Every structure is written in C-alpha cells, then in structure tokens.
Amino acid sequence: MYYLLILVLLFLAELFYFRIADRCNIIDKPNERSSHTKVTLRGGGIIFYFGALAYFLTSGFEYPWFLLALTLVTFISFVDDIKSTGQMTRLLFHFSAMAMMFYQWGLFSLSWWWIVIALIVCTGIINAYNFMDGINGITGGYSLVILAALAYVNKEVVTFVEADFIYTVICSVLVFCFFNFRKRAKCFAGDVGSVSIAFILLFLIGRLIIETEDFSWIVLLSVYGVDSVLTIIHRLMLHENIGLPHRKHLYQIMANELKIPHVIVSLAYMTIQTLIIVGYIYYQQYGYIFLIGCILLLSAIYVLFMKKYFSRHIS
C-alpha cells in the first residue's frame, strides 16, 4: 500500500511538473545533434529527486548528507536545463556534492589518494550517464535494470542500504518510464534527470562496494561504461573536441543511421546489461575475471560494430 501511494503521488508530481514546464517553456528543441525530431518537454527526470526526497521524508531523515548532495546536483542541473551554466560553476556544485556523499560513505577515514581516485571515478560515471541520455527509454530502462539488480543483491547477497530507499527510487523511475519509454516521449529526462539518477545509483553502488570491499561490482555499469569510454577514445582518434555535442555513441548510430526504433535500442541495452548482471552474480567468486571478460567482450562488439556501420554516420 505504501509503494502504491508513493507511485500515485510521484505520478501526480510529474503531471504537475509538466504544467510548469509547459508554462515556463522548459522544452527540448531538436537540432542536428539530436536523435528526436519534435519539441518535447525537458526535465521530467526531476521525478528521480522527488523519489529520493520522498524516502528521506518518510524514513526519519535517513542519509541526510547524501540528500543534501543530491539536492545540490539536482539544483544546478535543473538550472542548466533552463539556462546554460558555466563549466566551473557546475564543477563546483558537483565536487561539493561528491564531498558530502563521500562523508556519508565514511570515505574520509581512508587515505587521501583513495578520495582522489573516487572523485575521478565518480565524476566520470556522472558525465558518462549524462552523455548516454540521448534516446527515448534508455535512461529510465537502464536505470531500472540496475535498481532491480541492487534490490536483489541487497536482499539476497548482502545488505548495504535500507531496502525502502531502492524501492522508492524504483517507483520514480517507473513513473518516468511511463512518459518516456515510448515512441513519442511525453518528456525527456534532461540534465536534471540523467545527473540525479546517476548520483543516486553512484551512492548505492558505492555503498555496495564499500560494504563488500569488492570493486568488481562496477560491472553493474559496464554497458554504459564501455560505450562511453570507447566513444571518447574514438573521438580523440578523430581529433575532435570531446567537450562538444555529437552523435557517435553506438546507441546513437543504431537509432539515427540504422533507423532502429529508440525503444528497441533501449531494450537491447537493458537486455545486455541484465545478462551481464545475472552472469556476474552467478559467477561472483570470479568477480574481477568476469568484469575484465565483460569489458573485453563489449569492447570487441563496439569495435566490430563501428567498423561495419560508422561509415554511415553523418557528422
């Protein structure tokens, strides 16, 4: 009953946001770099923050430093959706938020170089998740797969977080998917959505890694990770400015050049990540070997795909 109520309230909150976005003209206009062709409401992913906030308010204010950190990145990302902000301003907010999350993790008791490594890895993951938000359904669907896996691990393998937190966030993702996981999306996540859900997943996976002292759990993000890293390497090889927008991710080639429906591409990413997670949990005793094997296999698929289809890409 609790989750049904949360689901209804989040659904109503999303509808209320749509009215605000429509009235304030918070929209995403298609351009030559877009994978969509119609004007669509932007920022629907703010519902992820509301999901985390709902848990915070009903749990006796659990994880306060994390919630404050999430509020910071959500705020600056929403502002960026409305009016572009400077890179230094965004970095200041993101680094401040990550410092708070590290404090919630208890990371400051470790050596300083662990903190530096964590900062680099976390920054990379958030940016990658943001870059991968380019077609209908991919952010919501991929996040749903990871959250479902985390819920299973939390219940059956090792308890690393309050279960209600994961389930409440899942409710928010389901609401977003209702409006986005379709041929003609009602809304896009926006930076506020992709960054906030990335931050939430990062917090959960970070707690899991700290609890188990096993970094191989990063396999939960392997599909996004390989696509993001190899696309950056590819663009560097092409002597491009990696800070500029583009349409060279594997999923973008599938959706734009091969004309595969967005929902099908998103389902493909979800399915591959699901299979990897199931395999990892089954062969968990070989965690790092499995992780390396997945990275190599996904990298091979990426390279072969690009060799065959990248020539169709129109810059």
What are these regions (language model features)?
Residues 210-315:
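C-terminal membrane-associated helical module and adjoining short loops/tails
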Residues 1-229:
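"…together with the soluble PPM/PP2C metallo-phosphatase catalytic core" -> "…together
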